[in-house]
């Protein structure tokens, strides 16, 4: 059963906590993690580009010239795709759906694998508490400097906290997420994961049946 140190905001080790093997001691599978990340990124994608077909462009109802006798190629509408300003063939459409289905068990397994990897490489940190009595970005940045890990970190808290969010949102190398919003795609972007100690209990409860 893996165990990690618990730190306070001064960077001092104040204890140790054990982690469950089923969640933090899982053997990694690069291919599974990759497929889940690709799917989660695809599911975030929205379609903005939208081209018009010849049926959606205004005008072009009249035949530009008669069928025969002009010496020119026959044309039926100035909104045909070969005309400048005509409809687009096979262009991007806003109704295109990029979403990819992910099995729940596969998504959970990939999540446990990435967390297990962070634990095995000493990139998983537990902090006893983030005090919010001084809700300043400067305060949170100061904690990040003294804690024993890299500055670029994903911080996991048990539930939504608007005060902490305000403290973190201007720090470009720190992202704040709640336990139930923790995704593999977010985890792989940050080399270090920081769990506030109550988040561990919330995580274990959320995935107790996994």
Model-derived segments and spans:
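Extended polybasic, low-complexity segments that bind anionic RNA or targeting/receptor surfaces
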Residues: 1-46, 92-210
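A short, flexible low-complexity segment enriched in Lys/Arg and Gly/Pro that occurs
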Residues: 30-68
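Glycine/serine-rich anion-binding loops at beta->alpha junctions
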Residues: 54-91
């Amino acid at each position: 059963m893996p165990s990690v140190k618990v730190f306070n905001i001064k960077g001092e080790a104040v204890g140790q906590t054990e982690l469950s093997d089923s969640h933090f001691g899982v053997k990694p599978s690069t291919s599974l993690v990759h497929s889940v990340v690709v799917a989660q990124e695809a599911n975030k994608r929205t379609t903005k580009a939208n081209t018009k077909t010849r049926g959606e462009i205004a005008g072009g109802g009249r035949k530009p010239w008669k069928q025969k006798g002009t010496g020119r190629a026959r044309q039926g509408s100035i909104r045909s795709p070969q005309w400048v300003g005509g409809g687009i063939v096979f262009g991007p459409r806003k109704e295109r759906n990029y979403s990819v289905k992910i099995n729940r068990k596969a998504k959970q397994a990939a999540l446990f694998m990435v967390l297990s990897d962070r634990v095995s490489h000493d990139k998983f940190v537990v902090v006893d508490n983030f005090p919010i009595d001084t809700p300043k970005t400067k305060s949170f940045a100061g904690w990040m400097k003294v804690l024993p890990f890299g500055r670029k970190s994903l911080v996991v808290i048990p539930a939504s906290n608007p005060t902490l969010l305000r403290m973190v949102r201007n720090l470009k190398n720190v992202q704040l997420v709640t336990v139930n919003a923790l995704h593999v795609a977010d985890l792989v972007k940050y080399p270090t994961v920081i769990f506030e100690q109550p988040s561990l209990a919330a995580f274990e409860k959320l995935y107790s049946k996994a």
